[in-house]
């Protein structure tokens, strides 16, 4: 639909209709006056789902979460001034985690800037270098030349959400008065309405969707050190595969291709729990989940040194693993989907401009057969994992929160969306999430690793999702974004929040700063003492305290009457930090316990 009421409604309706024809399905709108033309065009379109959010920061993370799950850009709309500035944290996260996002900020016309016109800031390049493309639209004009310009700018903007990788596009949209569709202005554009041919104007516009996640982009010849296949890459040495968070997200085919590579080469796979691969265990791959513990044993760490490493995605989170890798002098090949530097260790890594699918196909076509030495190497990893698992299972009997996290994988329905908050929940998952075949999808905000927007991101993931969505979070992360509960009525879906409440920043309890007792509690642990039952009642959210594993297992299938429910697990961060330290110490001095 094109609205010829006035130049602003014309511009906004042409922009929205063009984006819709390109594939826009979801918008998140923050109320405000200067963005009125955009809001009205989106609300009246009929083909775009619109969520309204009072808080711009919460809105932006809601859009981020939805983009994470769908892989499609979400239009994020706000008015002028500091409203737009509140989008910045989510834009930074979207940039680093490669989530498509189309930001539309309403603005005053240039003549009203730098003269204290009110609610006016400099919004040009407001988000710095984080958008992969940004521009300011020209003021709306009532002519076909402007419509053509707007159509092509919208087309370019949509494509830039996907290319060269998934990311953020910012369109600053200045509007002059009148901002609303007033009928008295319609007559002045009647000639344009008669000239406008919708069939001709939108001819050739078709849905432009994302590339497959994990698909390699075309790179300049000299960008990567080696192309693929490369004569420098020899699959014969003892090899190891590292799998971490995938920039741009994952697909089932990507994960099964990784397993195919591992099976074809006979390489064991050290898989971060923040990658969904742990939930795709096929029983035929040496999938190693306890690596953080077992490489703490000096004898094991020495015995398991590989001759070659293939890294897919980012490095796993484990500090122990990263320290171990820093002591190893062997080639590390990184499959570089989007041309990023994925080596925080600054090692002598070799980037391969290839997709996982290309490597899997190459290995299959070459007919690789792992030799006896490689099979023994993989078996050694599996045997040490078995021994370490015995120690861990015994220790978990004395740990409330870690045990709950370890068992959560067996409680959730298959194909659950699990969003994991940063800080301690990420570590509990890394340490104790088991390999399984339930195909859970793991989501994280590991672009910038912040705790902001945790609840809102999870709600965006849950919105219009067909299955279960679960948020695993600590108390501070949930409190930091408690405004997200205001979007409950807008969310179409269900969200279960597993709240690990240890009354403070549990991650700091595991760091050296915990020894500074005079400042630790007040300035780092920052306990808030919030009654979450009361907080949930304020927002009309179901709340239940989970005291044991049986309680947790009984929560699925869920029958909650409200879109959101909170299952609170109360823990003691002091005891849990000491317990974890003791468990890690067992492996550091484990020669007497293991073979």
From Swiss-Prot:
InterPro entries, A to Z: MenaQ_synth_MenD, MenD_middle, THDP-binding, Thiamin_PyroP_enz_TPP-bd_dom, TPP_enzyme_TPP-bd
Cofactor: Mg(2+); Mn(2+); thiamine diphosphate
EC number(s) given by UniProt: 2.2.1.9
Pfam families: TPP_enzyme_C, TPP_enzyme_M_2, TPP_enzyme_N
Catalysed reactions, as listed in the record: isochorismate + 2-oxoglutarate + H(+) = 5-enolpyruvoyl-6-hydroxy-2-succinyl-cyclohex-3-ene-1-carboxylate + CO2
UniProt-listed GO biological process terms: menaquinone biosynthetic process; phylloquinone biosynthetic process
Cofactor detail note: Binds 1 thiamine pyrophosphate per subunit.
Domain of life of the native organism: Bacteria
GO molecular function: 2-succinyl-5-enolpyruvyl-6-hydroxy-3-cyclohexene-1-carboxylic-acid synthase activity; magnesium ion binding; manganese ion binding; thiamine pyrophosphate binding
Family recorded in the similarity comment: Belongs to the TPP enzyme family. MenD subfamily.
Subunit structure: Homodimer.
Protein purpose: Catalyzes the thiamine diphosphate-dependent decarboxylation of 2-oxoglutarate and the subsequent addition of the resulting succinic semialdehyde-thiamine pyrophosphate anion to isochorismate to yield 2-succinyl-5-enolpyruvyl-6-hydroxy-3-cyclohexene-1-carboxylate (SEPHCHC).
Protein name: 2-succinyl-5-enolpyruvyl-6-hydroxy-3-cyclohexene-1-carboxylate synthase
Organism encoding this protein: Synechocystis sp. (strain ATCC 27184 / PCC 6803 / Kazusa)
